[in-house]
Amino acid sequence: YYPSICTTHGFADRVRNLKICREAGLEICSGGIVGQGESDEDIVDMFLALQELEAKALPINFLIPVEGTPFAAIKHRLTPLRCLKILALARLMHPAAEIRAAAGREYHLRSLQPMALFIVDSIFVNGYLTESGQGRDEALQMIDDLGFEIGIEYSRASTDGFACLVTA
């Protein structure tokens, strides 16, 4: 499915670059975006490819249809339950990796968003590339309401705006 989305480079180019990074001693943080018209098999293939790359962290993004972009009118099949299943599949296929719920989680998970925190290790807050995300205070309240604790202080976290979660 990758060639129908990315036209500037091939999937093999991406894999080669990630392997070079891993061989240089870098930990791989590589995930994907769902909701672009991919099949269930495409999602499984993505997670299988990430297994081969030994990704340490997998950010899972959910497409936010932005007006004026090629994906604005895409007919996605992302329901809150489907998004949870995708996150659960990531967890099952990558039990030792850090699974990160990234862009679009608020938009697609809606009222089921807190359930995702039982699957993932971290969430992105305060904005994404094209859209604003859930604010820090609202995310912290959700985390606290569930009885989780922040594993990394937000003010000391790296600039990519994620907070790691640790169960109480």
Residue positions per predicted region:
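Auxiliary Fe-S-binding modules of radical SAM enzymes
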Residues: 48-168
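Active-site C-terminal subdomain of aminotransferase-like
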Residues: 30
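Conserved non-cysteine loop/helix-boundary elements of the Radical SAM core domain that shape
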Residues: 1-25, 33-54, 70-82
